[in-house]
A protein has these predicted regions:
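C-terminal motif of bacterial Sec signal peptides marking the signal peptidase cleavage site
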Residues: 15-18
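Bacterial signal peptide processing site
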Residues: 20-23
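Early extracytoplasmic/lumenal segment of secretory-pathway proteins
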Residues: 25-109
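A structural signal for short loop-to-beta-strand junctions that line the ligand-binding cleft
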Residues: 94-99, 117-148, 165, 175-178
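Ligand-binding "clamshell"
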Residues: 110-118, 129-136, 244-260
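A bilobed periplasmic-binding-protein/Venus flytrap-type ligand-binding module shared by bacterial periplasmic
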Residues: 147-154, 268-281, 300
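Periplasmic-binding protein-like
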Residues: 172-180, 291-315
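Ligand-binding pocket segment of bilobal, Venus flytrap-like solute-binding proteins
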Residues: 181, 185-187, 191-260
Length: 355
């Protein structure tokens, strides 16, 4: 099964960021954009993070946190889904203090297993009420909008559909890519089920698979494939294409397209952070969660990774479109944990993973 495969491949990496030494050091690269000062000496604290966020996106933030606070940081990288399954298997014996998820579903799954601790009100109050769980067990720290990325040589905006439901039309046969095992896609599909019912959601997925949809393992692989013309379009998070355009402006031939404002295909999905109930490093865990919502880190997320900031007072990158999509406040993300496993089962049963 997927968990067994994961356990043989993921490694626990200790990130030594100049903490605890007698001579303070400074950061370079993207981490220096968050904290440009000298690193603190070791403070005696440590925190172990299981991160479903991609290493190249979140690692500069963790480096800056370790540098600024002097906290010893250890990280285990993996997919949000697999890490959530691993945490459930480890239970109270886990080394993890903090779990960073690409989306709320895996966090909701852990909440349903009573594995999450209570986050302090001083951290929860840094975001709007709809951006943390009602029970106070997770907090959002950035937002990603679901979009359709498309190859500009093959399509123009006026030829694209108004709704994600229209992708089952025969004129899009063999042209749509889906990241079926990706955590944010599974979360999105869980909301789809919640909004429209299991029968309608399952029928849509089966219809799009019957329309010869193609499977890719993640958002980035779809964006790259669309940019080189390997696939015509695909369902992804918005920020991957911004990053690809910034890195390869002359060769990448893909743009984002938003469905109608209230379409389920334009859902805003948030990244979520939580701490484990079994954590013995509660103070360091709270420090990290609060750090994710500081202005420099939130600015980094929107300026460098093109995500939507969630902390009050931080202005989104001017390149990002206004958030007129299906708003997160209209979706009860606390329900995602309960539907997470069922949504994954429906995705697997659809046959998309064999495409």
């Amino acid at each position: 099964m997927i968990l067994r495969t994961f356990l043989t491949t993921v490694l626990l990496a200790s990130l030594l960021f100049g903490c605890g030494g007698s001579d303070p050091e400074s950061l370079d690269g993207r981490a220096a954009e968050i904290d440009g000062g000298e690193c603190s000496g070791g403070n005696g604290k440590s925190v172990t993070i299981y991160s479903g966020r991609t290493e190249n996106l979140i690692n500069p933030v963790l480096e800056a946190f370790a540098c600024e606070t002097g906290t010893d940081v250890q990280v285990r990288w993996g997919s949000s889904i697999n890490l959530a399954l691993l945490l459930n298997e480890e239970g109270s014996k886990t080394q993890a203090d903090v779990f960073l998820s690409r989306s709320p579903g895996p966090v909701g799954y852990l909440e349903s297993k009573d594995l999450l601790g209570q986050i302090g009100e001083d951290v929860l109050s840094l975001v709007d009420e709809q951006n943390h769980s009602a029970a106070g067990t997770w907090v959002g720290f950035s937002g990603r909008k679901r979009v359709l990325v498309y190859n500009t040589d093959e399509f123009s905006p006026e030829t694209l559909p108004d709704s994600v439901f229209d992708l089952t039309d025969p004129k899009f046969k063999g042209k749509v890519a889906i990241p079926g095992t990706n955590g944010s896609f599974v979360d999105w599909f869980t909301v789809f089920i919640d909004q429209y019912g299991e029968e309608t959601a399952t029928q849509w997925l089966n219809d799009i698979v019957d329309n010869d949809a193609k499977y890719y393992p993640n958002n980035r692989s779809i964006v790259e494939a669309a940019g080189r013309g390997e696939i015509s379009m695909g369902l992804v998070n918005h920020y991957y294409n911004y990053q690809e355009v910034a890195a390869n402006p002359d060769t990448h031939k893909a743009l984002n397209y938003s469905f109608n404002d209230n379409d389920i295909g334009s859902l805003l999905v948030i990244t979520a952070a939580t701490k484990l109930a079994s954590s013995e490093n509660d103070e360091a865990a709270e420090d990290l969660l609060a750090y994710l919502l500081t202005a420099p880190v939130q600015q980094y997320f929107t300026d460098r990774t093109f995500e939507y900031p969630l902390a009050a007072g931080v202005v989104p990158n001017a390149a990002l479109p206004a958030l007129t999509a299906l708003e997160i406040g209209s979706v009860d993300f606390d329900k995602l944990g309960g539907g997470f496993e069922e949504a994954s089962r429906i995705v697997e049963a659809s046959g998309i993973l064999n495409r």
